[in-house]
């Protein structure tokens, strides 16, 4: 991680009472980064799986984040997870009440509330200052086993699908992931990411490079199939040409034709002619990342989607190859 890793680990080895005193002192000194990193490690404790009403002093209503999210994406998910950690560490019961422009709670469209069965109606309800959070996973953490364990722990505890989402994803997963199949998962981004090359974000591999790497890893892992996660129809066609009868996909809409023909700037501006389009795009995206996390191995560019799949996988891939090509300048 960095030079402070040993300090953070040491603080988390302290007895609970002493840990809380050190944490409170760091809060008073405005050492927010240290506090949030310590809290992230502290969340590995199984006690957070068994919290009860008496463990919370108030309810924290999370109504905003770092950005005004218009739809579900992984930045939103990681932002909310960071705020959940911040709330729980301060003995506040988190309730995510972040709504989009249509008045829909983005979190509840797909997930259960954290500690959904706990209610503390007689205690104060506070509104979160959602912009005050530092504990985001960095792009480099996708290839660090200890950080995958930390964030994977949060995904396992708090990214709990609601009934409708779970039924949809379970059925799609059942159609793709089977005991007699060995599958290499491949994620390949395009559209706005490769067109805009957002500054500070990881450089994405060329299609030819990801095709070559997929072929190499298929042989190494003895995989018969590739599960392909992409929003680009041209990528799908290239993979089917290179690997005929070996490509598996779930239900999705491809964005590239609409993206190019509509003079659009960002993928969020692509819309399909169907009811509840934003919700369905989020559901299909989330399902594809979950299926990707269940493959035997992964080959991917470094992006929010591949990061989420790696965290969901929790260091269980037989092979994890993430292209490290630096950042867009």
Ranges and model annotations:
Residues 76, 96-99, 187-188, 228-232, ...:
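Short His-Asn-centered micro-motif
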Residues 102-107, 194, 232-238, 329:
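Short, charged/polar "capping" segments at the starts of alpha-helices
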């Amino acid at each position: 991680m960095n030079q402070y890793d040993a300090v953070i680990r040491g603080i988390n080895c302290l007895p609970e009472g002493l840990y809380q005193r050190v944490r409170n002192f760091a809060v008073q000194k405005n050492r927010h980064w240290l506090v949030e990193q310590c809290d992230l490690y502290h969340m590995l404790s199984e006690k957070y799986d068994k919290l009860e009403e008496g463990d919370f002093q108030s309810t924290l209503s999370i109504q905003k984040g770092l950005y005004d999210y218009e739809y579900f994406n992984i930045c939103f998910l990681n932002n909310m997870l960071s705020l959940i950690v911040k709330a729980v560490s301060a003995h506040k019961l988190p309730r995510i009440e972040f709504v989009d422009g249509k008045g829909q709670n983005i979190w509840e469209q797909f997930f259960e509330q954290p500690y959904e069965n706990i209610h503390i109606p007689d205690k104060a309800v506070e509104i979160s200052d959602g912009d005050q959070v530092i504990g985001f996973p960095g792009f480099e953490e996708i290839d660090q086993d200890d950080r995958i364990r930390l964030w994977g722990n949060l995904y396992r505890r708090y990214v709990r699908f609601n009934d409708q989402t779970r039924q949809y994803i379970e059925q799609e997963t059942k159609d793709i992931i089977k005991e007699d199949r060995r599958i290499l998962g491949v994620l390949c981004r395009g559209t706005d990411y490769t067109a805009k090359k957002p500054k500070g974000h990881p450089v994405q591999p060329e299609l030819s490079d990801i095709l070559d790497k997929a072929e190499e890893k298929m042989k190494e892992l003895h995989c018969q199939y590739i599960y392909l996660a992409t929003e680009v129809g041209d990528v799908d066609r290239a993979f089917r040409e290179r690997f005929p009868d070996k490509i598996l996909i779930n239900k999705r809409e491809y964005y590239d034709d609409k993206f190019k023909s509509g003079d659009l700037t960002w993928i969020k501006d692509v819309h399909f002619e169907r009811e509840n389009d934003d919700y369905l795009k989020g559901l299909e995206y989330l399902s594809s990342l979950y299926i990707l996390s269940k493959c035997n191995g992964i080959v991917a560019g470094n992006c929010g989607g591949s990061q989420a799949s790696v965290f969901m996988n929790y260091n269980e891939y037989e092979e994890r190859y993430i292209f490290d090509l630096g950042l867009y300048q």
